[in-house]
Amino acid sequence: MTSKINYGETPEFQKDFKRLLKKFKSLEDDLELAKIAAIEFFHIQKINNLSIFPIQGFCTEKIQVCKIKKFACKALKGRGSKSGIRIIYAFHYENCKVDFIEMYFKGEQENEDRERIRKYIENS
């Protein structure tokens, strides 16, 4: 099945991902699954499976910045979708594009980096 969404990553996201991949070896596969089971369900098929939450204060008519809270990580056995890994991304309505902005582990960082999101929006 081909994706209807084009995916991109910020350099900061790539650093986050690389750092977490050392700790959680299944992240690459887990992210691919999240693209289909969460992002495409929510934005394309309009199915809300309660894993994605828009971040207030960062949504416009053109961009919706969201947080994936329910992210299943196989490397964290027994935790299922409550892995504690969070992904912040921006969905661009006009060209059906997702840019991954941030990935973090809740055990190391409490919340998203709002300044990073602000900078992303300013540069979009």
Where are these regions (language model features)?
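Short conserved beta-strand segments at catalytic cores or DNA/RNA-binding microdomains
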Residues: 88-92
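Basic, Lys/Arg-enriched alpha-helical interface segments
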Residues: 1-81, 94-98, 106-124
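Short, surface-exposed coil-to-beta transition loops
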Residues: 82-87
